[in-house]
Amino acid sequence: MREINSLVVVGSQWGDEGKGKMTDYFAQKADVVVRFAGGDNAGHVINFNGQKHKVTIIPSGIFNSEVTSVIGNGCAVNLINLVKELETIKNSGVKLGKLLISDRAQLILPYHILIDGAQEESRGARKIGTTKRGIGPTYQDKAARLGIRVADIEEEDFKETFKEIFEYQMMFLDRMFNVESIDFEETYANLINAYNVIKDCVTDTGIFVEQAIKNGKKVLFEGAQGALLDIDHGTYPYVTSSNTSANNASTGTGISHKLINNTLGVVKAYSTRVGAGAFPTELLNEVGDGIRERGHEYGSNTKRPRRVGWLDLVALKHAIRTSGIDYLFITLLDVLSGVEELLICDKYILNGEEINYIPATSSKHEKCKANYISMPGWKEDITKVKHFEELPLNAKNYLNKIAEICEVEISGFSVGPDRLQTVITKEIM
């Protein structure tokens, strides 16, 4: 076997960290780009040839015609939305790379979307903040062994099996939420039509990825959302329904963990969060409003304004531990230009005691107060910086403090949305 050259890129906060920008950057070097978790609830924007492209489930490598993009078995796939997304990208004039889809990936179906919306509405004041795209119910069905996988469509008795599950889901929606039924034949026809568009892409992607790595290919694993939204290690219950940490790259792809040799955690220079859940460093003032506007902190899918706060290193160190992060990449550093005083949370205060971890329960996390380190900001425009040495002293100190407290090397930072506004301080792929 040749030398392993693989890299996992994961978000190290609550999502929206700029993973798409980094996976797009590394996709220029990679031979294969793999999505290993999540569904089309995690939109990100890629700037390519002067155009902005919003992608949700398709790996970022699709914009490089020399790259093979893989949707792994850990993903939840809405085939109809996938086909629409591919058509939109094609119609913009982009020459697409090769796409492979795991035959073991779970399918998001129309009843999952209905259940997602009905469940969220029924929670009242205890809403989780789901995007209502059917992700949670899809993973619920997976665990309950009611899920339908891509490979199942080729089974001879698929229509009968699908109809049985469909009728069960309709009964559940009617009895629990009084939701009107949808038509089975139309749902089935739409699913088959979408499948026929992509069926040549369907394969055992685990075998493909394993062979690519063993043959010396550069393989990039693209995480979705963020480590703090992980179903096991995130800020439960305000999490997503899949494992978003880097440790799931092997399980969600179908390869050995021994074939992955580097993990990059992408983190904003500040913190953001969407929906409910504890946020000890949240800024509910003009400073936070300014960061939101300069950073364009609105959901790429939902357009919802994101909650904004100071950088939380307690949360970041939690992500580093649970994902085994080797390097950090800091995004949106330019957004902090002009902020006179910068605060970094290095520990929490819970019931008068200092702690350096995220409590397991949301009630205790809500009670945590942030303990801050104060650092002077910088006024200079850094959007044209090409090297670390060109940064203002205070910006250098800010990055160095993050690396010092987290005990993880920073491999680069971004000073704007364009691919060329990416500064690499250490090559890791």
Curated annotation (Swiss-Prot):
Binding site for IMP: D16, E17, G18, K19, N41, A42, G43, H44, T131, R145, Q225, T240, R304
Keyword Iron-sulfur attributed: no
EC code: 6.3.4.4
Gene3D superfamilies membership: Adenylosuccinate Synthetase, subunit A, domain 1 (3.40.440.10), Adenylosuccinate Synthetase, subunit A, domain 2 (1.10.300.10), Adenylosuccinate Synthetase, subunit A, domain 3 (3.90.170.10)
Family (UniProt): Belongs to the adenylosuccinate synthetase family.
Species for this entry: Mesoplasma florum (strain ATCC 33453 / NBRC 100688 / NCTC 11704 / L1)
SUPFAM superfamilies: P-loop containing nucleoside triphosphate hydrolases
Protein name, UniProt field: Adenylosuccinate synthetase
Co-factor note (free text): Binds 1 Mg(2+) ion per subunit.
Role played: Plays an important role in the de novo pathway of purine nucleotide biosynthesis. Catalyzes the first committed step in the biosynthesis of AMP from IMP.
Pathway where this protein functions: Purine metabolism; AMP biosynthesis via de novo pathway; AMP from IMP: step 1/2
Coiled coil region boundaries: none
UniProt cofactor(s): Mg(2+)
Gene name as annotated: purA
NCBIfam families, alphabetized: PRK01117.1 (NF002223), purA (TIGR00184)
Reactions catalysed, as given in the entry: IMP + L-aspartate + GTP = N(6)-(1,2-dicarboxyethyl)-AMP + GDP + phosphate + 2 H(+)
Assembly and interaction partners: Homodimer.
GO biological process terms held by the UniProt record: 'de novo' AMP biosynthetic process; IMP metabolic process
